[in-house]
């Protein structure tokens, strides 16, 4: 689309779009948006600045699995934040969250040693007292996570820490997992009560806005609405956004078709697993199309919910 065509566009971008999510929350130009979001979601309100960190962490050996985050930042006080947008449901997403959070924990020994050498040079023997800085993992997920039988189905926010089983005593406050479940959020504009409500509403509905709703007239949303307004995009930005958006549409359409196929198969065969088989076939077909578009194995895994090993097997199959 031409620049003039973009300038005539009305409305705002989809914040769950991979390109847009990383641009809004993972770029230096929009750092103030990320800080406002973190202060509202974590609730302490004391984050003044962050520095962006490497989003790819390699395992100890070449054969070990690596971790690739959407966004990683460190605050002035040394707290580490990992922020993820997950559209596709994954069976072991909680496990992956824990795996991801382990890297910044392990890296703190190296950081402590680096600080020691800056202060003392090569003199002295480095010893670390194991004092950790907090690590917080925040995930916005587009599916309902599994909870216990007493869980309120409308509760979209969950926060987990390490606690003693019987008393609930906190082991320490250095590891926290926060999950925001878009599938459980169904509040209307006039029902928004908290800033967390407002952020969830934006994730689900911003692409449907034609103008900025009055409920978002606070100053902290100014930059977000400026960046997300389609008429402010350059040609390259719009191209990248649309490419990422097409992946979402393709995924949703294929999964919807796969569900129908699976339901039909289940009715025909009387098998409860018919739906799941159809979904799995849909994910595999999406992955094959993404591979043809030269999308990375890691990105395909994140978007489809297939493991990297499953996607790699499709690569090997195509190369035979």
What is each residue range found by the language model?
Residues 1-320:
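Elongated, amphipathic alpha-helical interaction scaffolds
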């Amino acid at each position: 689309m031409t620049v003039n065509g973009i300038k005539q566009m009305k409305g705002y971008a989809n914040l769950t779009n991979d390109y847009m999510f990383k641009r809004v929350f993972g770029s230096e130009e929009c750092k103030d948006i990320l800080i406002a979001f973190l202060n509202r979601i974590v609730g302490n309100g004391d984050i003044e600045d962050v520095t962006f960190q490497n989003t790819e962490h390699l395992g100890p050996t070449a054969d070990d699995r690596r971790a690739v985050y959407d966004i990683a930042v460190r605050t002035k006080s040394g707290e580490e934040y990992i922020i993820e947008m997950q559209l596709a449901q994954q069976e072991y997403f909680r496990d992956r969250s824990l795996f991801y959070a382990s890297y910044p924990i392990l890296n703190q020994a190296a950081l402590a040693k680096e600080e020691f050498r800056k202060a003392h040079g090569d003199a002295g023997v480095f010893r670390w007292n194991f004092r950790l800085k907090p690590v917080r993992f925040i995930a916005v997920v587009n599916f309902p996570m599994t909870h216990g039988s007493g869980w309120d189905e409308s509760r979209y926010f969950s926060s987990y820490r390490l606690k003693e089983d019987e008393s609930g005593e906190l082991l320490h406050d250095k590891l926290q997992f926060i999950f925001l479940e878009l599938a459980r959020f169904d509040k209307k504009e006039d029902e928004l009560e908290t800033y967390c409500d407002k952020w969830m509403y934006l994730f689900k509905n911003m692409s449907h806005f034609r103008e900025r709703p009055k409920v978002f007239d606070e100053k902290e949303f100014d930059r977000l609405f400026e960046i997300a307004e389609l008429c402010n995009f350059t040609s390259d930005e719009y191209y990248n956004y649309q490419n990422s958006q097409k992946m979402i549409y393709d995924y949703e359409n294929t999964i919807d078709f796969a569900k129908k196929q699976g339901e039909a198969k289940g009715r025909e065969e009387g098998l409860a697993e018919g739906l799941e088989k159809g979904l799995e076939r849909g994910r595999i077909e999406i992955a094959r199309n993404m591979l043809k578009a030269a999308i990375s194995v890691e990105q395909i895994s994140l978007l489809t919910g297939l493991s990297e090993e499953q996607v790699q097997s499709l690569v090997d199959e195509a190369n035979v």
